[in-house]
Design a protein with these regions (language model features):
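Extracytoplasmic/secreted proteins, especially bacterial periplasmic and envelope-associated proteins
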Residues: 67-74, 78, 130, 134, ...
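N-terminal secretory signal peptides that target proteins for export/translocation
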Residues: 1-17
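Juxtacatalytic substrate-recognition/specificity segment
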Residues: 40-147, 151
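Beta/coil-rich, acidic/histidine-enriched accessory regions frequently appended to metallopeptidases
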Residues: 35, 245-323
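Bacterial N-terminal signal peptides
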Residues: 16-31
């Protein structure tokens, strides 16, 4: 989840509200937040950037928890693999130890160069860290400008779409498993009866998976119009390289225009016109067939003779696409 810097995002848990207030006041009082609280950060260097990792004091574990630092490195490597570099030169990652097992409640803030808070259960295992998607999702948020609240779908949609692809490109996720999950989950982004466009219908499914649907359709169309020379990753890198990261406020139209300039085709702007204020329901079954993706139980089978098989491979692997 990306914190709503421009329009008072409603944080849905008391724990997140308290944490946000604590972080805000500590940052007002001191430029060295970790030092103020008596916490010493552990620094990870990845993708040309510095990630300071702090485990909050008083919890059931500390920075030495098995698998924890590898988890941070893997997430940073995934984002770097997709964007070509880590989105911000220096961020702070605050880990909140909680009871139970698993990783949850990640929030990314446009503060101090980039701040991520996330909760980790005391019983979380190295295997849990290795299979996690949430920290990668939060780090992707660093790579897109803050936009108005009615465009929140693009922030969450990009993070939802890019995260599994980034993990595949970093060799941390199996491509067949990735595409199986996309085929399984993307229909949640299709408009339901009574839904409007993405700017007007703000349900969970339309925000996260509707935004991801926009990204997939854009990715396929960019590849189609450029004969697989460019993809959505080029558009998003172009936005980031033009200064469009979480620390700045941009109009969505500006971000899409910059992305289109990076690919040389007006796909993002045209698709936004199609999906922003009215429901649009693409034929996903036909799209999967064109891409050569056949669902087979709990996995998928790839058909490399399909019309857009080369596009599927380019989306999956980027510049390292097997020939």
């Amino acid at each position: 989840m990306v914190y709503r810097s421009r329009a008072a995002e409603r944080i849905r848990s008391i724990a997140n509200i308290v944490a946000a207030l604590q972080i805000f006041f500590f940052m007002l009082l001191s430029p060295t937040f970790a030092a103020t609280t008596g916490e010493t950060p552990t620094t990870i260097l990845e993708g040309g950037s510095r990630i300071d990792v702090v485990v909050e004091n008083g919890g059931p574990f500390d920075i030495s928890k098995p698998g924890l630092l590898d988890w941070v490195r893997w997430a940073a490597q995934a984002v770097t693999a997709y964007y070509g570099r880590f989105p911000e030169p220096h961020i702070l990652l605050r880990i909140r130890p909680v009871g139970g097992q698993g990783i949850r409640h990640g929030v990314t803030y446009p503060w101090g160069g980039g701040l991520i808070t996330i909760s980790v259960g005391a019983d979380t295992t190295p295997a849990d860290f290795q299979s996690d998607w949430e920290l990668t999702h939060e780090m992707v948020h660093l790579a897109f400008p803050s936009v108005a609240e009615n465009h929140h779908w693009i922030e969450e949609g990009i993070a939802t779409y890019v995260e599994p692809i980034a993990r595949v490109r970093a060799h941390h996720f199996d491509p067949a498993e990735m595409w199986y999950e996309v085929v399984r989950d993307l229909p949640q982004g299709l408009p339901a009866a009574g839904d409007q466009g993405l700017d007007n219908t703000h349900t969970w499914g339309r925000t996260y998976w509707g935004g991801a649907l926009f990204c997939l359709l854009a990715d396929v169309e960019i590849h189609r119009e450029t004969q697989n020379k460019k993809g959505l990753d080029d558009a998003l890198r172009g936005i980031l390289n033009a200064g469009g990261n979480i620390m700045v406020d941009w109009d969505l139209e500006k971000a899409l225009r910059v992305g289109d300039q990076a690919t040389g085709v007006p796909v993002l702007e045209n698709l936004y016109d199609k999906m922003k204020d009215k429901p649009y329901t693409p034929d996903l079954d036909a799209l999967w067939k064109e891409l050569g993706i056949e669902r087979n139980g709990t996995t998928v089978r790839f058909d490399d003779s399909a019309p857009l098989a080369a596009t599927r491979k380019a989306i999956t692997y980027g510049e390292n696409t097997p020939q």
